[in-house]
Amino acid sequence: MIGVRSEAPVFPPVENLTAPVLLAFFKINCPTCQLTFPYLQRLADRGGPRIVGVSQDDAEDTAEFKAAFGVRFETVLDTGYPVSRAYGLEYVPSLFLVEPDGRISWRSEGFAKADLEELAGRWGVRLFDAADRVPNYKPG
């Protein structure tokens, strides 16, 4: 997987950025993605960065996943996985924060509560509520 400070491979969601964008790579049948994506939507709802889901599945399955897990942020399809390969993905979910200068400033894979809290903190967002029962880490 490409690292922090690396130049992000370019594809439409990261072209001509004026603000950071969080890329969230996923597969619909991944239990860790199913855990993570509602919290990513919460991050978006509470004033976090623009988020773009990058689906490794087809349009119909992706739409069903979004409806089932309450995901409303933009998604794009990675048919044949060229973008996933360019980012060096080994696991999903994999998350990359791409800055307007085209560099990756943060990344995470799986469900890592501390990573997500750190990311949310960049926007002054409290991501997890006291009632949330989430693991500290769940691999993808």
What are these regions (language model features)?
Residues M1-L17:
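N-terminal "domain-start" segment that seeds a small globular fold
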